[in-house]
Amino acid sequence: MPKSEIHPKWYPDAKVICNGEVVMTTGSTQPELHVDVWSGNHPFFTGTQKILDTEGRVDRFMKKYGMGSANSATSKEQKADKDSQK
C-alpha cells in the first residue's frame, strides 16, 4: 500500500516577486518565490548593459586579505627606501 501525504503541497498560482512587485505566476511547492533577477530586468533579455556587481572577486580578495592597492604602494615605497639606504 503506498504512503499517503508524502508529497509537498502544490500551489498552482504561486507568485514570483522581484523587487517587491509580482512579475508572474507559476506552479510551485511554495506560495511565493522571491527573486533578484528575472527575464524582465536581466541585461541579456532587455538589451541594456548594467553592472550588477561593482566589486569583482579579485578586488574582494585583495580587500579581505589586506592586499589592496594602498598596501602594495606603501610596500613599494618602503622597499625603495631600503634599497636607497644600502
Swiss-Prot record:
Cellular component terms per the entry's GO annotation: ribonucleoprotein complex; ribosome
One protein family per Pfam: Ribosomal_L31
Disordered as annotated region, ranges: 66-86
Keywords recorded for this protein, A-Z: Ribonucleoprotein, Ribosomal protein, RNA-binding, rRNA-binding
GO molecular function, one term: structural constituent of ribosome
Compositional bias of kind Basic and acidic residues: 76-86
Example GO BP: translation
UniProt subunit comment: Part of the 50S ribosomal subunit.
Family listed: Belongs to the bacterial ribosomal protein bL31 family. Type A subfamily.
Function text: Binds the 23S rRNA.
Protein name (Swiss-Prot/TrEMBL): Large ribosomal subunit protein bL31
Source organism of the structure: Prochlorococcus marinus (strain MIT 9215)
Record lineage: Bacteria, Bacillati, Cyanobacteriota, Cyanophyceae, Synechococcales
